[in-house]
Amino acid sequence: MLRLDLQFFASKKGVGSTKNGRDSESKRLGAKRADGQFVTGGSILYRQRGTKIYPGENVGRGGDDTLFAKIDGTVKFERFGRDRKKVSVYPAAQ
């Protein structure tokens, strides 16, 4: 007796669902003004999560840890302590 051993392959690709394909929108964190740049009061200087950079002179800290200028002046990024950084705004010399 003759036996045929046939193998049939799918003619259509099986379509399954995927668990990938999502990502959250970037939050655009980081420096918004450069060292030595002139800013007006209320300008956002640095957006961050937590206190990566601390507020210095004439700089406030928002509820989401955003640093902003309290007065018009020049931005200065500085180091303080051994491993900390702060940003200050100094009034323009007149």
Swiss-Prot record:
Q: Tell me which UniProt keywords the record has, alphabetically.
A: Ribonucleoprotein, Ribosomal protein
Question: One short Pfam family name for this protein?
Answer: Ribosomal_L27
Q: Which Gene Ontology BP annotations are present?
A: translation
GO annotation, cellular component aspect: cytosolic large ribosomal subunit
* Residues passing through the membrane, by range: none
SUPFAM superfamilies for this protein: Ribosomal L27 protein-like (SSF110324)
Which residues are the propeptide, according to the record? 1-9
**Superkingdom field:** Bacteria
Q: Which Gene3D superfamilies match?
A: 2.40.50.100
Gene Ontology MF terms:
structural constituent of ribosome
Instruction: Kindly provide the PTM information from the record.
Output: The N-terminus is cleaved by ribosomal processing cysteine protease Prp.
Q: Which HAMAP family does the UniProt entry name for this protein? A: Ribosomal_bL27 (MF_00539)
Q: Which family does it belong to?
A: Belongs to the bacterial ribosomal protein bL27 family.
Query: What is this protein called in UniProt?
Result: Large ribosomal subunit protein bL27
